């Protein structure tokens, strides 16, 4: 099965898990807001968790708790980001705060986030919970650096984006019971997250006016101004793809998945580029 086929099947499964999660909480007064926040989405992060779980020899059903929790955390973080950034659209529709207002969205995300962490603890234990809390803290630090510190672009995107990718991949070590691969799987997520975000920031320069650029992409302006944006982005992509390739050679993945594992950086990058009608870097 190709990674695209796996993603399509995993996405359908994650959508079903989210629907079941919402149906089990029909007593919420704010269930409609939760449904709105969690709807749609590419489900890349949850898919990575499911994919690496089976690649490590685990049962895909053991990844369901992690995949669900990751997508809840990701969607909640986006809803909060939209409030902070005053972004009026999300996933092709109005942002949740535009529809429901800031207060309700903040209240419901404050419920969703600990609920997701509880799912992780219930599914994989206290060590997985502690790891998840530390990564969620890193996400918050990354958001602060994104807004107020332009000193280290790579560190910013590792924290801002890489942390949830790291959560996606490290939970596969727990789900597959390959606990000895925990640090390696954290690094897998780190490298994929950096690759994903640098391409995403590059796309911003190709699809927006310069004055509309915000977030971590603003830290790339000096390369844009000097006419070196493509060169820099390509160098980051190749550097972290090489690190990723070297790393996965030392992880006990099942051989039948190795080809698709190696293709993941290209899959993530090309997905972002093609969505923006960009052929290549």
From Swiss-Prot:
It holds the Pfam family polyprenyl_synt. Isopentenyl diphosphate binds at residues 42, 45, 74, 91. It comes from the Archaea. GO terms for biological process: isoprenoid biosynthetic process. Mg(2+) 2 binds at residues 81, 85. Keywords: Isoprene biosynthesis, Magnesium, Metal-binding, Transferase. Binds 2 Mg(2+) ions per subunit. Highly thermostable, remains fully active after 2 hours at 80 degrees Celsius. SUPFAM superfamilies: Terpenoid synthases. It catalyses: 2 isopentenyl diphosphate + (2E,6E,10E)-geranylgeranyl diphosphate = all-trans-hexaprenyl diphosphate + 2 diphosphate. Optimum pH is 6. Catalyzes consecutive E-type condensation of two isopentenyl pyrophosphate (IPP) molecules with an allylic substrate such as geranylgeranyl diphosphate (GGPP), farnesyl diphosphate (FPP) or geranyl diphosphate (GPP) to yield the medium-chain product trans-C30-hexaprenyl pyrophosphate (HexPP). GGPP is the physiological substrate. Homodimer. This is Hexaprenyl pyrophosphate synthase. It comes from Saccharolobus solfataricus (strain ATCC 35092 / DSM 1617 / JCM 11322 / P2) (Sulfolobus solfataricus).
